[in-house]
């Protein structure tokens, strides 16, 4: 009989963790019945629904959001969940205490810690403390790199964890297959040297630095142009930066696309 596994993730848009989840679920056999809980809708949820995967969306943008506790608890009981797999700290924070109360084991995959060096001392300590709590409430902690595990050990004494590095979907990213030439679609010539940015347009990805770097690079070589593919909460700021640097003709933008191998 299949195990009912609740895969929890903070957003339904397509990003690194979300792409990982798509590939993870695609690799499950009939011993696992995945059910997805996301805290926003988006392309990932649409793609999983089309595959026949049951998906639930409980809207929130906050970690440790007690307002949705009852709704999540009812969902877990209704779906007879036997294992919870949380991707990222925000997702884990909203299910960790519920999992412990219901005596359901939780696996926490760290797709990068919520604390980093650019935060104030207080915020960084608070985030590290919250990560420590989440890890203590988890049956197992998976780090996607040895670097992440070492950071956890040094920052808050992470004890029980394993490293499972992210892989590449060789069916999708197969260098031996034919790819579409998208240069004409984006207005690039064969002589253009195109630099790509594919990902969420958020602070962590530094899209403003990308725009600035392209402007600086073009001072050295006019063949350099750029393609920026993605969506996020810094879209308008990024478009404004493109205008300020006078890069409208040299940096093309596109929302999320499913044909990333062709784009690359």
Language model region names:
Residues 15-26, 193, 197-219, 226, ...:
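A conserved mid-protein helix/loop that constitutes part of the nucleotide-sugar donor-binding site
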Residues 86-94, 110:
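Short His-centered aromatic/hydrophobic patch
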Residues 174-188, 194:
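A short helix/loop element that forms part of the nucleotide-sugar donor recognition site in Leloir-type
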Residues 46-55, 148-171, 175-177:
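Helix-loop-beta element that forms the nucleotide-linked donor phosphate-binding surface
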Residues 234-237, 247-258, 263:
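Active-site donor-binding acidic/aromatic loop of nucleotide-activated sugar
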Residues 66-70, 105, 115-137, 150:
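Nucleotide-sugar donor phosphate/pyrophosphate-binding loop at the beta->alpha transition
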Residues 43-50, 227-248:
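Short, structured helix-loop element that forms part of the nucleotide-activated donor/catalytic region
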Residues 7-11, 15-30, 38-47, 130:
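Short amphipathic alpha-helix
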């Amino acid at each position: 009989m299949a195990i009912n596994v609740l895969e929890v993730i903070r957003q339904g848009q397509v990003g690194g963790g979300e792409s990982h989840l798509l590939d993870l679920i695609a690799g499950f056999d009939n011993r696992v019945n995945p059910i997805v809980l996301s805290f926003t809708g988006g392309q990932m949820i649409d793609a999983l629904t089309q595959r026949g995967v049951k998906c639930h969306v409980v809207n929130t943008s906050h970690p440790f959001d007690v307002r949705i506790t009852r709704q999540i608890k009812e969902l877990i009981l209704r779906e007879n969940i036997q294992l919870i797999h949380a991707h990222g700290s925000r997702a884990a924070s909203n299910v960790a205490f519920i999992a412990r109360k219901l005596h359901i084991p939780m696996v926490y995959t760290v797709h990068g810690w919520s604390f980093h060096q650019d935060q104030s001392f207080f915020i960084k300590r608070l985030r590290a403390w919250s990560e420590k709590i989440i890890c203590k409430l988890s049956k197992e902690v998976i780090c996607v790199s040895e670097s992440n595990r070492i950071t956890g050990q040094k920052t808050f004494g992470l004890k029980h964890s394993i490293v499972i590095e992210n892989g590449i979907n060789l069916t999708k990213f197969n260098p031996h297959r034919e790819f579409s030439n998208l240069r004409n679609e984006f207005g690039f010539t064969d002589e253009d040297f195109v630099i790509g940015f594919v990902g969420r347009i958020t602070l962590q990805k530094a899209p403003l630095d990308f725009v600035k770097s392209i402007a600086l690079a073009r001072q050295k070589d006019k063949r350099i142009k750029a393609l920026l593919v993605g969506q996020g909460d810094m879209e308008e700021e990024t478009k404004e930066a493109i205008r300020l640097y006078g890069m409208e003709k040299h940096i093309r933008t596109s929302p999320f696309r499913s044909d990333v191998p062709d784009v690359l």
